[in-house]
Amino acid sequence: MDEEYDVIVLGTGLTECILSGIMSVNGKKVLHMDRNPYYGGESSSITPLEELYKRFQLLEGPPESMGRGRDWNVDLIPKFLMANGQLVKMLLYTEVTRYLDFKVVEGSFVYKGGKIYKVPSTETEALASNLMGMFEKRRFRKFLVFVANFDENDPKTFEGVDPQTTSMRDVYRKFDLGQDVIDFTGHALALYRTDDYLDQPCLETINRIKLYSESLARYGKSPYLYPLYGLGELPQGFARLSAIYGGTYMLNKPVDDIIMENGKVVGVKSEGEVARCKQLICDPSYIPDRVRKAGQVIRIICILSHPIKNTNDANSCQIIIPQNQVNRKSDIYVCMISYAHNVAAQGKYIAIASTTVETTDPEKEVEPALELLEPIDQKFVAISDLYEPIDDGCESQVFCSCSYDATTHFETTCNDIKDIYKRMAGMAFDFENMKRKQNDVFGEAEQ
């Protein structure tokens, strides 16, 4: 362990690896450690399949029908990338795309009255959708046109709406949209987990719907991308970036103590040695006394031998179950991927259902999602506590990431990364400033 570093990073989750990569590119001297022998922390992909069975204490191990264990890479935290979202921009600006291959997720679906429907997000799809009646379609189309033309710097596009003060509830009212359409707009397009957004100023919701439409416009089938070989590839891509710029990596390295002087971090002790630093980044598991519990998420990993019904036999898709449809406060999500993404044996599918826990019986809460997946070959149930830091770290210079939430995209994770960056660097994270080269995520790869 070299003595002096600008930044020490503990844990190789996605948030930590992206920050470590960005800090290295910015010329900081970085030491990155993880107590685990593998990359990814909470956001790793588990391989071989035997390892997943062990992790969930299923001692009998996988049956032969599951195929070769090495063909599996199972994500512990299910998320997709928005094609036009912040994580893709981070991948592009750092050129980490050169280490990864992506596929477009084949479909985005929403649950209504016990059935699933394709999410309409263009005028043409909206007019053809069975989700709404004829008059509702016309009103929804008007709303989509309004959102597409909306420009916060051009008051001529406002149509009497003030982006800073008009609530989203009032915007829906203005277009006379019914409850079902409001549900799917807020939850399947703007991707909110709850209905708290309705009474907030409408600008953020309008921008979220724009992000969905722009992401969809890039590749057509859905706005989501997924990396071949699983999400565990993402932290590793950023770890490579950090190493190229001189970052030092140590896996399987226990952390004995974080050393503080006068309330500020000065180093990390591991196996009797001390590495000194000016700033520390870590996930909540490294500093339990500096985080508080902010809720729980249940995630159920399901292995299937068939595509999900009514998805047109898609080999990947997302299903959103809006909370109002199942009398809840938070949405339920299903992410499905398969052998087509090199994460499962031939003919096998992985569907992960997740939601924010609201009761003392979390498994019952995700039942509406599990019903859509039947028959299920094997289930792995994980209930995780969500943690957030108790302070902003500016005084101690210890910057802690938040746990990964129940959403099925990385926008909230990217907000956390930008927020930590701002607190560490004293200035906002600027894509333009740092972007060295803009190219397509797919490079020359087929879509």
Curated annotation (Swiss-Prot):
Localization, UniProt: Cytoplasm; Golgi apparatus, trans-Golgi network
Biological processes, Gene Ontology terms: negative regulation of axonogenesis; negative regulation of protein targeting to membrane; protein transport; Rab protein signal transduction; vesicle-mediated transport
GO cellular component, one term: Golgi apparatus
Family: Belongs to the Rab GDI family.
Cytoplasm listed as a keyword: yes
Signal peptide: none
Taxon lineage: Eukaryota, Metazoa, Chordata, Craniata, Vertebrata
Assembly and oligomerization: Interacts with RHOH. Interacts with the non-phosphorylated forms of RAB1A, RAB3A, RAB5A, RAB5B, RAB5C, RAB8A, RAB8B, RAB10, RAB12, RAB35, and RAB43.
SUPFAM superfamilies on file: FAD/NAD(P)-binding domain
One Gene Ontology term of the molecular function aspect: GTPase activator activity
Gene name of this polypeptide: GDI1
Keywords: Cytoplasm, Golgi apparatus, GTPase activation
Record-linked InterPro entries: FAD/NAD-bd_sf, GDP_dissociation_inhibitor, RabGDI
Role description: Regulates the GDP/GTP exchange reaction of most Rab proteins by inhibiting the dissociation of GDP from them, and the subsequent binding of GTP to them. Promotes the dissociation of GDP-bound Rab proteins from the membrane and inhibits their activation. Promotes the dissociation of RAB1A, RAB3A, RAB5A and RAB10 from membranes.
Entry protein name: Rab GDP dissociation inhibitor alpha
